A protein has these predicted regions:
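Conserved beta-strand segments of alpha/beta enzyme cores
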Residues: 49-51, 102, 159
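Short aromatic/hydrophobic contact patches that present stacked aromatics
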Residues: 23-27, 73-75, 169
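Well-ordered beta-strand positions
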Residues: 18, 113, 130, 137, ...
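Active-site lid/adjacent beta-loop-alpha segment flanking the redox-cofactor pocket in flavoenzymes
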Residues: 158-159, 175-227
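Helical element adjacent to the flavin cofactor pocket in flavoenzyme catalytic cores
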Residues: 74-140
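Central helical "cap/lid" subdomain
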Residues: 131-186, 204
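Dinucleotide-binding Rossmann-like beta1-alpha1 core, especially the glycine-rich loop
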Residues: 1-61, 194-199, 203
């Protein structure tokens, strides 16, 4: 996973699609500091740049943090933020220009066609995709539809182990210390797993998220349409 993450990050940088904000995980307890030390060892083994920081060093990178309640932090300067919509748009454009990719926008998938002979595992071979604009013959179909992927997979009598979940996040701001950066994100993302929270800059505001809640699963059929 570390190698996959590094390769993905490098690809986004090569395409000028990422912003290297850096990321810091802070520790409030000695047990957490011990975990960060273990993580430092793993980062070194994988060749990923990382640093263990004392509270004062964390404060230098994130001036609005209260250094009195932490013992230190694990800093990875190559943590980056990527706009998924922009990234998909740029990759699609390059695929069209360089590889002859065909794109059919605003096209609804109605069904996945399969042959009549089950394989030993009980599944059938894909033969095509039915859309509201016609049928496309295909030997392979890649399902990459986010939270709606299972709806497509069901059409081929298969299943993708993916369940959407609601995540809690609060937007705080605007804050002068953030607005003065004139960036979408100018400070490192901070994770505080002793409280199961994290924060990240969003232009002049701060987004604070929490993992300290029960899992809130959400069926894709209940997600409102953009229309």
């Amino acid at each position: 996973m570390a190698l996959l993450g590094e390769q993905s990050a490098n690809q986004y940088r090569d395409m000028n699609l990422s912003v290297d904000s850096g990321g810091i995980e802070v520790a409030r307890t000695q047990e957490r500091m011990d975990e960060l030390q273990r993580r430092m060892t793993s980062a070194t083994a994988w060749g990923i740049e990382a640093h263990l920081l004392d509270p004062a060093q964390v404060k230098e990178l994130v001036p609005f943090i209260n250094e009195d309640v932490i013992l230190g932090g694990f800093y990875c300067p190559t943590v980056s933020v990527v706009d998924s919509l922009e990234t998909g748009t740029v990759m699609r454009k390059e695929a069209i220009e360089k590889a002859g990719c065909q794109v059919f926008a605003n096209t609804e998938v109605l069904d996945i066609l399969t042959d009549d002979t089950p394989r030993p595992n009980g599944r059938r071979k894909v033969t095509g995709v039915v859309t509201d604009k016609g049928t496309i013959d295909a030997e392979h179909v890649v399902v990459a539809c986010g939270v709606w992927s299972n709806q497509i997979a069901y059409m081929a009598d298969t299943y993708i182990p993916l369940v959407p979940a609601v995540h809690q996040m609060a937007d705080v701001g605007p804050l002068d210390v953030l607005a003065e950066t004139n960036n979408e994100i100018g400070y490192p993302i901070v994770r505080d797993m002793d409280t199961f929270c994290y924060e990240r800059q969003s232009a002049g505001s701060m987004e604070v998220g929490s993992y300290a809640h029960r899992p809130i699963l959400h069926h894709p059929d209940e997600i409102p349409s953009n229309e």
